[in-house]
């Protein structure tokens, strides 16, 4: 079967840069889906995207759809005709389903059967519908119309190229008649560009100053930016999302170095970086110490004969932005950070929970409660908590919301606050996402935990639980943040106490009954997903969860111990024994016996197990007290042999009630040893 390369390019006005990659991938996926549905084979697929175009290249696409056969079985003959040979409703219904007369149905076999051979269509006749369907299915939240046309798309369309081999596909899509003429760079080559063949698409456009391959543009920008940064004795800050956005803004990228006045470096560099990245799409430069250099890199969409004009233009544009940041910084410093706190009395945190000022006071008290329990200073944590939200009322944060916490840090230092108190104002928001940085100070950790617990308790306390994908107060992220800080920073905080303190701080604003348990359940449930991501079996998590440890660090240490235990050869058998013992003890009416008396032993294996349990108990008590859980379980693994011998030789449910109770007590002691670490019966 013959095959040809297929190219489709839709030309438009400038597409939304942040959506360009998504649109391109969806365009390719839609075309691929259409080709597969039509049974059309091909060799490879490529997608290209630039500010004014979306294109897909399919290599070695079959030029003819294969023939196909339809074979449908109907009702049995005896059900299809009555005794007189007249067709029943079953037969007539089958014919109607097939879209033919009953006479066209094969009646020779045990069942009615309809067979049809469908001849394949030329690929060229199928492509317009495939392309149009793909464009209609693009994830475009809001489509627009232009001129007096009825067609809708994300931006007005300007041209359409559709080639199968050397032939133009005759069609009109989104008000554009297909041809072989594309367009070059808006300034360098504004005239049309003839695409000589699908395989020459990239080369033909490159000659017209258009790099249609986004990956090529991205690599060029990244490489050239790094080279220019090195020449400036610096390192460029190139966030992946900013690089993608800049790549989507230019067809012929030309990175250039610009500068700004050094006086602006007195402003917190985070504010300067934020405005240059978010508003101007610039790449900022840092020196070897991580300090901002008074230079930046812009990516022009033109190869100018006089690049100095472009450089000066960008320097002129950025100056008012930096001047604004400088003004806000100076204005805010005219008063102490603490003075902004009163303004927060008029800023609502949550209607039922009070103002942001109220929240800061609660955070202050809770942070002071937490700090000494994780090795910190209560007074400093209280101070940091009180100042934690002050910068929300500053002009800097009002203009640059991303500066919350960061602005507070600089203003606190300006006021002479201790370094760890100042740092805590920024670290309270950590971690800002999955895998993000954690607080570096104990004071910061205490405030971060307090802030998150206060939000969790407050929102749960008014019944606004997260549901499905809706989590407006980011409670899941808050819970995971608390867990990450405690586990990864190795802080042994009893969350039972901390959550109870947080509940009491709200007073009558929340429904306190059962609230602490609800919040704790939610927090520790987040560990399940965390461990699953780390490859920890859910049974391991559940074995520890059954004990309800209050410390996240302790919880994690137990999980790691159970993970190690499960690799031991004795693990499976001991888990099964614990399951058996658990089932036996659960059937006892009343309290489980606790007294073991050797006089009721009537089998040597009972003596052996009792002796082994006593020895193990003595050995593991100091281990468990020191939280050496792996060592504890490894030592208990030695009980497998006497346990197996006991169950082989001893009938637990003896007829004599005292003997039976004695054996229950022995098994309860055995199970209690393991429960010092986890309920390993869950592993069976």
UniProtKB/Swiss-Prot annotation:
Signal peptide: none annotated. InterPro entries: DALR_anticod-bd, Gly-tRNA-synth_bsu, Gly-tRNA-synth_heterodimer. PROSITE patterns: AA_TRNA_LIGASE_II_GLYAB (PS50861). The keyword Electron transport does not apply. One of its GO terms (biological process) is glycyl-tRNA aminoacylation. It is found in: Cytoplasm. GO terms for cellular component: cytosol. It catalyses: tRNA(Gly) + glycine + ATP = glycyl-tRNA(Gly) + AMP + diphosphate. It holds the Pfam family DALR_1. Its main location: cytoplasm. Keywords: Aminoacyl-tRNA synthetase, ATP-binding, Cytoplasm, Ligase, Nucleotide-binding, Protein biosynthesis. Its EC number is 6.1.1.14. SUPFAM superfamilies: HD-domain/PDEase-like. One of its GO terms (molecular function) is glycine-tRNA ligase activity. Belongs to the class-II aminoacyl-tRNA synthetase family. Tetramer of two alpha and two beta subunits. This is Glycine--tRNA ligase beta subunit. It comes from Pseudomonas fluorescens (strain ATCC BAA-477 / NRRL B-23932 / Pf-5). The lineage of its organism: Bacteria, Pseudomonadati, Pseudomonadota, Gammaproteobacteria, Pseudomonadales. The gene is glyS.
